[in-house]
Amino acid sequence: MAKNKKLFEYLSQHAETISSTWYETIEETDPNSIYASTDPVVIHNLKSQNLAFNYKINRIFIDDEDVYLPILKEWAFEVTQDQEHLKTPIHYIIREFVRVRDLYVSYVKEFVHLNQNTVKSEEAEDLYHALIKAFDLVIHIFIEEMYKNTSLQLQAQKDMITELSAPVIVLFHSVGLLPLIGDIDTVRAKLIMENTLHQCAKKKVTQLYIDLSGVAVIDTMVAHQLFSLIEALRLIGVSSTLSGIRPEIAQTAVQLGLSFEGISLRSTLASAIASDLKLKKV
């Protein structure tokens, strides 16, 4: 990387001007973009982040890559944690990186012009190349950090959806309820199995009501998954009761030759709970 302490000092002296010029020339109308915000706090943070970046990128002209690169990575990591940046489409952010880079190129050109007696054309080309390379590195780092952050958010959302698709609700003490609603295919049945076992163990549930009143259709594969769930629950010390089996499912079960032998059944969830409470009182 080309070194030039005088250029570093020149850019550092103009860092605030570069930042101000950049912000004042933003043209943004998309309300989803951080660059269109009118919130004073958001604006202040955005300006501070940009100015901090300017001071850090300037160091490419005095430091080796193994020194300045971790500093730029740390800046990129912090900015990609910012909710306002996370809400902003990535192509807007890249556009602003390019605008800042173009401003820097103009300042480097001005520096070369002011110091044409000492900065030769070959050295000037090296300085331009160093600047472009540094910005390319930062953009790459930023996109990578944004991808990591977005992936973590998507995984968290996926985990939440999975949990909500088969929520184990603690009714009282160690008694829980698993209300199943909607269509259940083999993929969802597998998620229900994994999530239910995990939640029962986590919430210390020893008795679980599995209510099927919201399920209209069930096939052989899903039924076997359901039976496997009940058996797996038994192995971890959880007794299960099926309730709310609709007539359509009962008819399908008979036609498919499915057996509910050995499984505790109740017509409704209310009757299942009432029956168990009555037995406990006796």
UniProtKB/Swiss-Prot annotation:
After translation, the protein is modified as follows: Phosphorylated by RsbT.
Query: What CDD domains does the record tag this protein with?
Result: STAS_RsbR_RsbS_like
User: So where does this one cross the membrane?
Assistant: none
Q: What happens when the gene is disrupted?
A: Cells lacking this gene have no visible phenotype in response to salt, ethanol or energy stress. However cells with multiple disruptions (RsbRA, RsbRB, RsbRC and RsbRD) have an increased basal level of sigma-B, indicating this protein is a negative regulator of sigma-B.
- Which Pfam families has this protein been placed in? STAS
Q: Which residues carry this modification: Phosphoserine?
A: 165, 174
Positions of post-translational Phosphothreonine modification: 186
Task: Answer yes or no on keyword Chloroplast.
Answer: no
Residue limits of the STAS domain? 165-276
The protein's UniProt keywords, in alphabetical order, are:
Phosphoprotein
- Its domain of life reads Bacteria
Which Gene3D superfamilies does this entry report, sorted A to Z?
STAS domain
Q: How does it assemble?
A: Probably present in the stressosome with RsbRA, RsbRB, RsbRD and RsbS.
Q: What does this protein do?
A: One of 4 functionally non-identical RsbR paralogs, it functions in the environmental signaling branch of the general stress response. Negative regulator of sigma-B activity. Non-phosphorylated RsbS binds to RsbT, preventing its association with RsbU. Requires any one of RsbRA, RsbRB, RsbRC or RsbRD to sequester RsbT. When RsbS and the RsbR paralog(s) are phosphorylated, they release RsbT, which can then bind and activate RsbU.
Looking up PANTHER family in the UniProt record yields: RSBT ANTAGONIST PROTEIN RSBS-RELATED, RSBT CO-ANTAGONIST PROTEIN RSBRC
This chain belongs to the protein called: RsbT co-antagonist protein RsbRC
Source taxonomy lineage?
Bacteria, Bacillati, Bacillota, Bacilli, Bacillales
Q: Which gene encodes it?
A: rsbRC
